[in-house]
Design a protein with these regions (language model features):
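Alpha-helical scaffold segments that form or flank carboxylate-/histidine-based iron centers
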Residues: 17-25, 46-65, 103-109, 133-145
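Alpha-helical bundle segments that constitute or directly flank the non-heme di-iron/ferroxidase center
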Residues: 10-44, 104-129
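Long, non-catalytic architectural segments outside compact domain cores
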Residues: 2-14, 18, 24, 31, ...
Length: 163
């Protein structure tokens, strides 16, 4: 029985590497989807909530494209986020119960998460062992990831300088 993220018998060495990198991006991007959904629930400004939900939807499309590529390579795509991210969300929930949460704190956490995600994608793009097809897909999807990071970084900087 194959586990999510596992390989089928017909993968080559290059495909195995591509699948591994793609599954790592899938896992981290699922974390991003979960983070955006949590942020939408916590935001007090409805404009932020709507934008968080829109970003979650965009990230789901990214995950879908990456999963399709893993399947085309003969692998089984990841279907869960990381254990570390789940633990981090639990910590944030506890922290928020103790200290409270406001939109500035939510935006700061989104900015932090986006920076982490962006780094994972840049590392993948710098991986010389990827096939050109996989690298091309990662580059296409990275454009959406980078745009999200840039947007929230600007919002966070504006909120920080305003108060």
């Amino acid at each position: 029985m194959l586990e999510p993220g596992g390989l089928t018998g017909g993968t080559s060495g290059g495909s195995t590497h591509d699948i591994s990198v793609l599954n790592s991006l899938i896992e981290t991007t699922i974390d991003s989807v979960d983070g955006y959904r949590r942020s939408a629930q916590e935001a007090t400004n409805s404009r932020f909530s709507q934008e968080f939900l829109a970003r979650a939807s965009e990230r789901e499309q990214v995950v879908s494209a990456l999963r399709d590529r893993v399947r085309s390579l003969g692998g089984n795509p990841e279907d869960d986020g990381s254990v570390l991210a789940a633990a981090h969300r639990a910590f944030l929930t506890l922290r928020d119960k103790v200290t409270g949460s406001d939109d500035a704190a939510v935006i700061a956490e989104v900015d932090h998460g986006e920076s982490y995600l962006n780094g994972k994608w840049e590392t993948a793009l710098g991986d010389g062992g990827l096939s050109s097809e996989t690298r091309s897909l990662i580059q296409q999807q990275y454009d959406s990831v980078r745009e999200g990071r840039d947007t929230w970084r600007r919002v966070h900087q504006n909120m920080s300088s305003a108060g």
